[in-house]
Amino acid sequence: MKKTLLILIILSLPLISKGSDNLVAVLYLKNGSYVSSDSVYTFLNLDGTLFDELRSRNGNEPTCLKIDRDNSVSYYPDLMIYVFFCKLSPTRKVLVRVGHDWKILKTNSPFTVLPTKRYLLSLDIQLRVGDILYDKRDKVKVKRCIIRHIIDARGDYVAVEIKKRKLWFRWKRHYQVIPDRLLYN
């Protein structure tokens, strides 16, 4: 009995571990035009019970009860795209991080799983007055709002180029993303 319990605990470790932020899931509710009024992304708790549904509604904002833009990596309302940190379970299910919790993503609607770094390198970032940028030696305080393309990403930091200097900005703290900074170009 103890041996069976130990095996079950070891097999479930990837699901109950802190997880990684090396992948993101990009959910498309609109692709040129709305995918359809029945475009549904279902989020299940790890025990299989329903957590929430993200639905496309023809001509309107997507509907969901418990998921808001602060629970995702990014939300692009003009394009109707949600982005979540994700990982694959040992049974090949896609798990997405909604806030601080992992949920099972179940859908027949289009979505893409990408390495987080590849996703970030396709974006611009908005830097605001008072933001702190770092290089090898200095801290630089942003004096006016600027938008720069992301040229590198490592962990919680992304790099931008300003006046031929590679400067780093902290875009997230662990799984908490600084909202409304990542811009889809």
PLM regions with names:
Residues 177-179:
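Residue patterns forming the tRNA-binding/recognition surfaces of aminoacyl-tRNA synthetases
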Residues 59, 107-111, 173-175:
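Surface-exposed flexible segments
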Residues 1-16:
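Sec-dependent N-terminal signal peptides
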Residues 184-185:
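Short, solvent-exposed mixed-charge patches
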Residues 70-106, 142-174:
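SH3/SH3-like beta-barrel superfamily modules
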Residues 20-86, 114-153:
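Beta-loop motif signature
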Residues 94, 100-123:
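Mature extracytoplasmic/lumenal regions of exported proteins
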